[in-house]
Amino acid sequence: MAVRELPKATRLLDIGTHDGTLFRLTGAGGVGIDPELVDVPPMAGVTMVKGFFPGDLPAQPDELFNAAVALAVLEHIPEDELANWAKSLAGLLSAGGRVVITVPAPTVDHMLHVLMGLHLIAGIEAHQHHGFQPADLESIFAGPQWRLARHRRFQLGLNHLYVFERTSD
């Protein structure tokens, strides 16, 4: 679903890339960053960085990105870091560039806790979700540099897709 929201001829910033799957699916070049990056074979035009966005992202002096994705990432970012996170993205995206974000509905955390309590699932990092509210994204990405292009719920309403476009300054 997120792939459909990306512009063609994309220079992509994949925040939370894990193994670079999105680069393989789209054929895009760019940078993938993830603190839990796994070893992946080199991909032409793609730089993989083990670390956190934005602090560990290498300088990008030559070219802006025309798309960024953060799929199931923002709910793991501490609330006091989100404004800087959005501001950093604005400085890296070209005018008209898109940021595609997916976040779970708060109901998902409750469901995960019940399933973990019943020992039906394990290894879920629900405690890292910081009580994130999807509706907060509209205020985090408020301001003259962003325009909400799309918001929809998917997977029976358990997840949200947001697409913000970078406006010209």
Describe the residue ranges of each PLM region.
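A short glycine-rich, Lys/Arg-flanked "PGG" loop and its adjoining helix->strand segment in the class I
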Residues: 83-95
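Class I (Rossmann-like) S-adenosyl-L-methionine-dependent methyltransferase catalytic domain
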Residues: 1-59, 100-169
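A conserved beta-strand element that flanks and buttresses the S-adenosyl-L-methionine
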Residues: 69
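Local beta-strand N-terminus motif with an aromatic residue
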Residues: 9, 65-66
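Short catalytic micro-motifs in class I SAM-dependent methyltransferases
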Residues: 72-76
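Short N-terminal helix/helix-N-cap motif within the alpha/beta-hydrolase-1
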Residues: 78-82
